[in-house]
């Protein structure tokens, strides 16, 4: 398996990526991993972190905020970023 294939996490769900990232952090914090393996799993962790950030950003763009009228009653929704 190529290095880029080992780092490919693009088809992971957010939950799967976070779970694997937590596992990697725990392994690195224990300190019982050889240097070469530590570097490899750190790189995988970076790929997982970036993937999670991408998924979170996409989710934020889909969230809408509730628009209130002058009386403070819900009037509708608008995109979070105001566009």
Curated annotation (Swiss-Prot):
NCBIfam families: PRK00977.1-3, xseB. One of its GO terms (molecular function) is exodeoxyribonuclease VII activity. This is Exodeoxyribonuclease 7 small subunit. The gene is xseB. Its EC number is 3.1.11.6. SUPFAM superfamilies: XseB-like. It is an enzyme of class 3 (hydrolase). Belongs to the XseB family. InterPro entries: Exonuc_VII_S, Exonuc_VII_ssu_sf. It catalyses: Exonucleolytic cleavage in either 5'- to 3'- or 3'- to 5'-direction to yield nucleoside 5'-phosphates. One of its GO terms (biological process) is DNA catabolic process. It is found in: Cytoplasm.
């Amino acid at each position: 398996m190529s290095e880029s294939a080992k780092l490919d996490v693009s088809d992971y769900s957010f939950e799967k990526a976070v779970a694997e990232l937590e596992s990697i952090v725990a392994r690195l914090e224990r300190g019982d991993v050889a240097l070469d393996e530590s570097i490899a799993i750190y790189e995988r962790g970076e790929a997982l972190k970036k993937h999670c950030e991408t998924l979170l950003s996409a989710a934020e763009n889909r969230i809408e905020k509730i628009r209130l009228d002058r009386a403070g009653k819900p009037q509708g929704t608008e995109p979070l970023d105001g566009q």
